[in-house]
């Protein structure tokens, strides 16, 4: 059984890491042997991820992440895995084909939603410049320059916060915390530079699932789990009902970002879902400025329990098998060991 981190963001979306090489160096140094790239709206990092894994004796998993909208849940006021926006639902894809096979209409749909995501941040940048001027600052942020300097093509409000922090506070003692503060106060809902998403920013849940499947992947529901106060969203509070609904919607894979949750909740939820037939994987995201360990931990412990490690390993083996057209987790396990010469 090997250590797995099946959900890592890279500079192809937003990441704590400055490069794919840095992400994989951290994984290698920490003994994490199976690593999954999982950027928002992008598969462009797959080639570098694959090559970097081969160089370091790691096994690559290929993923992607979307924000979708389920209108039925929205009308019902049901909070799914976005605690502030009913109906808005994050969806990952696991085990996508590499080389990338997406083409035709699904590719056009992906490119359109990514373009709209970038356009929203461009509108945000304009509002941020207006606010800076009103506050007496001479600084003017150049959207295209930020996009070229700090991104691989996909730009988010975190990139604006980073550029602003570097321009105003280049020697900040805690740059990650300051960037989070700037983002929260200026760019999120209620802030002077906030721009709400337009409807075209969100594809229907079913469309996202179809794009993932067209790319060879497994549609995956990311569980939010318990928050710091032990609360769950409307959708996730009843675990059996959530599992049944996910099956009815065509999901057979789920994931958790382990630092959000306690070991007790992870063992309860992940164990139940695996027993229900779901592929279960865990990851860390690393989609904030804060540099955290790649080796997984939980909200209340410095590492996963043996039970959680085993669940994650079995899930990774199933994803690895799917990725190359094999039909069992056992075949995936053999593939991983052969690939990294264990």
Residues covered by each model-derived region:
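A metal-dependent hydrolase metal-coordination microenvironment
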Residues: 2-155, 249, 255-316
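Acidic/histidine-rich helix-loop elements
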Residues: 8-18, 192-193, 225-234
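Flexible, glycine- and charge-enriched loops at secondary-structure boundaries
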Residues: 39, 198, 232
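Hydrophobic, aromatic-enriched interface-forming segments
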Residues: 125-201
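Extended hydrophobic/aromatic segments used for targeting, binding, or gating
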Residues: 203-213, 217-279
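Extended, intrinsically disordered, low-complexity segments
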Residues: 299-342
